[in-house]
């Protein structure tokens, strides 16, 4: 009633419990005897900007790439564990409700032989077996990690069965597959493991670091498991030379197989060149 002038500061309240995730659009309408004014209002909740998402993804990928340094004897396990816990803790601080980061921290602790910390983290995860369908990869990740903390063969078999059922329902999930082949005794045989990984690669073009690492480990641990040099095998070997994981034995074995090839393969050629840079061997040079 006492207002005079052409500007007024109007305060309004927003009930946070009525907001949904993302952008919430609203309108404030002011009616006077002379006119009706309308103001658009946008309230954002739990918005993850593209820049923020890319930054988080880069930081998490840094954890994986550093682990490859450890795999290639370029970094100690202790140093990797310390650095990775700092990175994942930073990610969790920025997104406290992200349960994947919680499980990833538990995984890092397991790999770093910090079992008590890993156990505490897993106990804080709110797992509900009846809600596994809501986020099957996250629930599968939790189950997979529990097998790393226990030697209970019956429990591990049950987890393997659960992961197998989940993978049958979601055959495009390379994450569930990578967990399954570590837990299910059926895939202890390298040929079985490589067959299912190759099928995943050919059908769904899986190309994550962890996926390639699972396949490369087979060749690294048993060179004779490399039976041919098809598209899948060459891509896995490219991964190996890129991150300097190639052993001398596997490099020579690859060169021997390559020398029997009748057609030129540019990607295989690049593998051999990288192998020769790592191991100055006549057999590799001849194959090139």
Where are these regions (language model features)?
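Surface-exposed binding patches on compact interaction domains or structured appendages
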Residues: 1-11, 124-129, 138-144
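A short beta-strand micro-motif common to beta-rich folds, especially ectodomain repeats
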Residues: 10-14, 21-34
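Low-complexity, Pro/Ser/Thr- and charge-rich linker/hinge segments at domain boundaries
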Residues: 40-71
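Alpha-helical repeat scaffolds
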Residues: 57-63, 79-91, 115-128, 152-167, ...
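Long, compositionally biased charged/polar accessory segments in the mid-to-C-terminal portions
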Residues: 68, 75-79
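Residues that mark the junctions of alpha-helical repeat units in TPR/alpha-solenoid scaffolds
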Residues: 80-81, 91-98, 105, 131-136, ...
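TPR repeat positional signature
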Residues: 102, 139-140, 177, 212, ...
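Residue-level signature for tetratricopeptide repeat
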Residues: 107-111, 142-149, 180-183, 217-218
